[in-house]
């Protein structure tokens, strides 16, 4: 297991690339979403490995990038800080310029990154991203529910028949193989409490409502925003509205998919990515 220290946290990372390749390839970095890990990007990365060296990593507090007590409380869970974590990761791996693909919360991190470090990105894919309006009552209810979801997590959930399917139902239009659904549930149960709760408040907040439209409007890097037609987490309309704020953003919607279009309809997703980045 490869790890690299970023601001006191041992971050898990892995390379997905063709083992027999001797020719240097451009690097594509994948950023996962809330409660997940780099694991769900592995099949997408493997499919792109002919044209890219793919770098996957677990965000601070998620997956295999565990937060130790010695640094807990020293770092915030603002998404801008996660963007800075990514910059430090690239520095340590001596990567000057990359392609970037972020999903959900990871897409918000990627958006902050390309505006803070535009010179470090060739092109970016934002998978399931968008902007939303502030509703005080709805947000308060969401925080309360989110707090319960994060607080009451037990490993015995993994032993409950079909728990993984129930957990993933809201995220999907098309079902996924059981081993993938179980991996999602495992990652959710593994997430650090403070990180999981903290990023709920920074991802869905009055500040995010005000800041994210400005961030989309500032985009100068060539960007593809991919939405799932039936996404209930970040509805396609929110992605369409976000894309309209910058002429550098191309919008693409995948039919009959929800919050994980790269897994629900991999052929369509991969073909669009390849067309966008200019590979066969």
What are these model-predicted stretches?
Residues 230-234:
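Acidic catalytic loop of the alpha/beta-hydrolase fold
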Residues 1-29, 49-52, 91, 95-96, ...:
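Alpha/beta-hydrolase fold catalytic core
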Residues 15-68:
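Conserved HGGG/HGGXW glycine-rich cap/lid loop of the alpha/beta-hydrolase fold
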Residues 115, 123-155:
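Flexible "cap/lid" loop of the alpha/beta hydrolase fold
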Residues 219, 225-227:
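Short beta-strand/loop motif that positions the catalytic acidic residue
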Residues 136-137, 156-217:
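Conserved alpha/beta-hydrolase catalytic His-Asp/Glu region
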Residues 56-101, 105, 271:
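Active-site loop/oxyanion-hole signature of alpha/beta-hydrolase fold enzymes
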Residues 257-270:
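Catalytic histidine-centered segment of alpha/beta-hydrolase-like enzymes
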């Amino acid at each position: 297991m490869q790890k690299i220290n970023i601001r006191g946290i041992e971050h898990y990372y892995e390379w997905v690339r063709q083992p027999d390749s001797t020719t240097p390839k451009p690097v594509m970095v994948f950023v996962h979403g809330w409660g997940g890990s780099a694991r769900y990007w592995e099949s997408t990365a493997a499919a792109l490995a002919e044209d890219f060296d793919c770098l996957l990593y677990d965000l601070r507090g998620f997956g295999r990038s565990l937060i130790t007590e010695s640094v807990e409380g020293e770092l915030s869970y603002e998404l801008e800080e996660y963007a800075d974590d990514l910059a430090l990761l690239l520095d340590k791996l001596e990567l000057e310029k990359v392609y970037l693909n972020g999903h959900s919360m990871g897409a918000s991190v990627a958006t902050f990154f390309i505006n803070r470090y535009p010179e470090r990105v060739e092109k970016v894919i934002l998978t399931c991203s968008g902007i939303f309006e502030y509703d005080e009552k709805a947000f308060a209810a969401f925080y309360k529910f989110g707090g319960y979801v994060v607080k009451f997590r037990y490993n015995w959930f993994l032993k409950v028949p079909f728990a993984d399917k129930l957990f993933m139902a809201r995220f999907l239009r098309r079902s996924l193989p059981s081993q993938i659904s179980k991996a999602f549930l495992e990652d959710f149960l593994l997430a650090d409490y403070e990180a999981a709760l903290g990023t709920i408040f920074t991802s869905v907040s009055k500040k995010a409502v005000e800041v994210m439209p400005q961030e989309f409007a500032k985009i100068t890097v060539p960007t593809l925003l991919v939405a799932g037609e039936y996404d209930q987490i970040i509805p396609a309309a929110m992605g369409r509205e976000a894309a309209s704020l910058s002429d550098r953003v191309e919008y693409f919607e995948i039919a009959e998919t929800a919050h994980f279009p790269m897994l629900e309809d991999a052929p369509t997703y991969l073909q669009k990515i390849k067309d966008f980045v200019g590979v066969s």
